[in-house]
Amino acid sequence: MVEADRPGKLFIGGLNTETNEKALEAVFGKYGRIVEILLMKDRETNKSRGFAFVTFESPADAKDVARDMNGKSLDGKAIKVEQATKPSFESGRRGPPPPPRSRGPPRGLRGGSGGTRGPPSRGGYMDDGGYSMNFNMSSSRGPLPVKRGPPPRSGGPPPKRSTPSGPVRSSSGMGGRTPVSRGRDSYGGPPRREPLPSRRDVYLSPRDDGYSTKDSYSSRDYPSSRDTRDYAPPPRDYTYRDYSHSSSRDDYPSRGYGDRDGYGRDREYSDHPSGGSYRDSYESYGNSRSAPPTRGPPPSYGGSSRYDDYSSSRDGYGGSRDSYSSSRSDLYSSGRDRVGRQERGLPPSMERGYPPPRDSYSSSSRGAPRGGGRGGSRSDRGGGRSRY
């Protein structure tokens, strides 16, 4: 755009609309021989648009005119005289703006892309609701929990608690607690489900549909665990174990947010209510946790063996993750947890505590989703406990 037009061609701007070609020729003709005078006029009114192109035969003359006449007054108006740029002034003038325009769109695009990028990342959190945040937290903290995890393994329930507490707190701040309290109140089952549904619907609605289990498991524990799974894989792990033991826990899990929170603090409380069971769940959860740690990725959550699977799978797959993780985690976690436990030689009590949740939970998750979760899971749970 800045490229100069042919030598000797000048752009004359800021002209009085009354100034015509003759006046221009009279003024500029004294500097040298003029080859062409092109006064730009409005097509409709044929009035001067206030600028013209004057082409001198000699480029030197044009330079002199540009130097002497630029800023001078012509017919009462200060005119601008400069080397004409390609293409003609009109397009030329438009030309310069176009670059900005072209640039502008890119900027817009960039901004948009940036925005899109930002939102996506944000979207993750938002989409998940508190979960993704939890996940992030859990994931970010996950490693810490894992690190903590080992002690928890040896420590047992307390460490677990602490571990969850970290993530939990963060998530609990988010509403894990509220979900929990709600979970307890509503933990009656359907009520809980309703509360969950609102949130769950938000995140899970798609998943809920996908998981008839969700509805059923809103029935509770395992199903809930699934919910949790959907939202918060980590919570699921805890939730599975924890709530498999304690119904209150289940409530939280069903919440999914509460999972972490629930399993962290809320769960602890619920656990306390359940008492031994909660501990067992913790232990089992710890065991599972330790087992997963052996695995590796799971460490972050430990019990999260499942959770890890989910989280990893989840991160990778998103929705499919849920289904896959649910089926797989159920089978795999149950089998694996046991194996891990046995390998570790965890105390039978732990083993015991852990399996029940697993069995009951796995069975409930499998059966409950179809069967109607609530009753099934409950019976499973009860049976599992008594059984083990």
From Swiss-Prot:
The modification Omega-N-methylarginine is found at residues 122, 141, 161, 169. Residues 148-161 have a biased composition (Pro residues). PROSITE patterns: RRM. Signal peptide: none annotated. Residues 8-86 form the RRM domain. InterPro entries: Nucleotide-bd_a/b_plait_sf, RBD_domain_sf, RBM, RBM1CTR, RRM_dom, RRM_dom_euk. The modification N-acetylvaline is found at residue 2. It comes from the Eukaryota. Residues 320-334, 359-368 have a biased composition (Low complexity). Residues 61-80, 191-212, 238-271, 335-344, 377-388 have a biased composition (Basic and acidic residues). GO terms for cellular component: catalytic step 2 spliceosome; euchromatin; extracellular exosome; nucleus; spliceosomal complex; supraspliceosomal complex. The modification N-acetylmethionine is found at residue 1. Coiled coil: none annotated. RNA-binding protein that plays several role in the regulation of pre- and post-transcriptional processes. Implicated in tissue-specific regulation of gene transcription and alternative splicing of pre-mRNAs. Associates with chromatin. Associates with nascent mRNAs transcribed by RNA polymerase II. Component of the supraspliceosome complex that regulates pre-mRNA alternative splice site selection. Binds non-specifically to pre-mRNAs. This is RNA-binding motif protein, X chromosome retrogene-like. It comes from Rattus norvegicus (Rat). The lineage of its organism: Eukaryota, Metazoa, Chordata, Craniata, Vertebrata. The gene is Rbmxrtl.
